Regions:
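Short catalytic-loop micro-motif centered on adjacent basic/acidic residues
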Residues: 26-30, 90-91, 113, 229-231, ...
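Terminal accessory/targeting
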Residues: 2-7, 22-28
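Alpha/beta enzyme core
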Residues: 7-21, 34-59, 65-85, 94-228, ...
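C-terminal alpha-helical cap/extension of soluble enzyme domains
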Residues: 2, 246-249, 258-330
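Short secondary-structure transition/capping motifs
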Residues: 29, 57-64, 89-90, 308
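An N-terminal domain-start capping segment
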Residues: 1-2, 142
Length: 330
């Protein structure tokens, strides 16, 4: 058993309370390799932002759970080396079983998500409560989910979304004891968050997605005043990255994300954690593809992973400073 406290990490409890009171959201950036982790820490130290290092089950397998634990500890020390002791959470994204959540807690995660949203309601409650009961013994915080997000990201796949029913949230939170709640109000996983028929097109022919269901969010806030709410699938899919990828050998068709002005609006509400994964993938892929085309003789990984890391840092700083409002809150 490894305690996250021995790694220098924190859980989400105080972080979320401050975010709700301050009207901003904590960035939850998905991470599975060294360059991503370096970019996240560099950006959040420079922006003086708290951060959640978010790891999916697939990323945990990819990075190896033991290496990941030491990478997280290294991230804490790296932030100090850069001159800022920012609050850092190590969080399991979309845990789908008690066993996986327990394993992460035992290996030093400070926060876990148990996603039983695909199960019948009472089974979701029972599974979530089982994880909460174990996690809280070690002061690890737990995120549950009500409602289903469409899209594909790592092992998470759903063809259709189901909006969160505000009438269920009080019962779910009281029965499970979760510390935060992921909801479905129209966000979606992946870089193709909406089908073309769900969108309109602007003068340049780029898809314009439908508005998020802020009415549902408002109802949930009324039911659970001051309770931490989480948005998954909140990448904006910057079209400049899509264009670079597609003009350098890629084939991303009709890629569309959540407009940043809608995320700014959400961050000012009870939404205190906003998950961003696909934007980071796009930033890295755009930088690497451009180098492969422009410098075809290059074969030193540092010469393409380094610029990809720099592009990631720029993206993450933008999210902290101009979208989520977390800059200066560490």
């Amino acid at each position: 058993m490894v305690s996250y406290k021995d790694l220098g990490l924190v859980n989400t409890r105080e972080m979320f309370a401050k975010a709700i009171k301050g009207g901003y959201a904590i960035p939850a950036f998905n991470c599975n390799n060294m360059e991503q982790m370096q970019a996240i820490i560099q950006a959040c130290v420079e922006a003086s932002s708290p951060v959640i290092l978010q790891v999916s089950s697939g990323a945990r397998k990819y990075a190896n759970q033991t290496l990941l634990r030491y990478m997280a500890q290294g991230a804490v020390e790296y932030a100090k080396e850069l001159g800022k002791n920012i609050p850092i959470v190590l969080h399991l994204d979309h845990g789908n079983s008690f066993e996986l959540c327990k394993s992460c807690i035992d290996m030093g995660f400070s926060s876990v998500m148990i996603d039983g949203s695909h199960l019948p309601y009472e089974e979701n409650v029972a599974l979530t409560k089982q994880v909460v009961d174990y996690a809280h013994q070690f002061d690890v915080t737990v995120e549950g989910e009500l409602g289903v997000l469409a899209g594909v990201e790592d092992e998470v796949s759903a063809e259709h979304h189901t909006y969160t029913d505000p009438k269920d949230v009080v019962d779910f939170v009281s029965k499970t004891g979760v510390d935060s709640l992921a909801i479905s109000i129209g966000t979606s996983h992946g870089a193709n968050k909406f089908k073309p028929e769900q969108c309109t097109r602007n003068a340049e022919g780029i898809l314009v997605p439908p508005e998020l269901r802020f009415d549902i969010l408002a109802e949930i806030e009324k039911e659970l005043p001051g309770f931490p709410i989480v948005l998954h699938g909140s990448s904006s899919v910057p079209q400049e990255y899509v264009k670079i990828i597609n003009t350098h050998g890629g084939a991303l068709k009709d890629a569309v994300g959540i407009p940043e002005e809608q995320l700014r609006k959400a961050a000012k509400s009870a939404v205190c954690k906003i998950n961003i994964d696909s934007d980071g993938r796009l930033a890295m892929t755009a930088a690497i593809r451009k180098i492969f085309v422009d410098q075809p003789a290059e074969f030193d990984p540092r010469k393409y992973l380094g610029p990809a890391r720099d592009e990631l840092k720029k993206l993450y700083m933008h999210k902290c400073e101009s979208v989520l409002g977390s800059a200066g809150k560490a």
